[in-house]
């Protein structure tokens, strides 16, 4: 699962144009890193392309931090594998 964390961090960093190491996984990505709805859609599209992840609207509303994105991605992959 650590690999998933690295991949998701890399994906988000690339989209928001930040160095991976500079992203605080607990910081609000909207207020701290200027993620707007378009960048949010780009992040979700990247997750869909990489993992086939289709995030339900209810879960989208829960996303505030990089850790939220990682958790939702891991949950999806676990359910898909199980």
Predicted regions: what they are:
Residues 2-35, 39-44, 49-82:
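Phosphopantetheine-dependent thiolation modules in NRPS/PKS and related acyl-activating systems
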């Amino acid at each position: 699962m650590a690999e998933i964390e690295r991949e998701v961090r890399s994906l988000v960093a690339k989209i928001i144009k930040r160095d991976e190491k500079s992203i605080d996984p607990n910081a609000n990505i909207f207020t701290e890193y200027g993620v707007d709805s378009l960048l949010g859609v780009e992040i979700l599209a990247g997750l869909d392309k990489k993992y086939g992840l289709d995030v339900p609207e209810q879960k989208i509303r829960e996303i505030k931090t990089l850790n939220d994105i990682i958790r939702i991605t891991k949950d999806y992959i676990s359910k898909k594998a199980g």
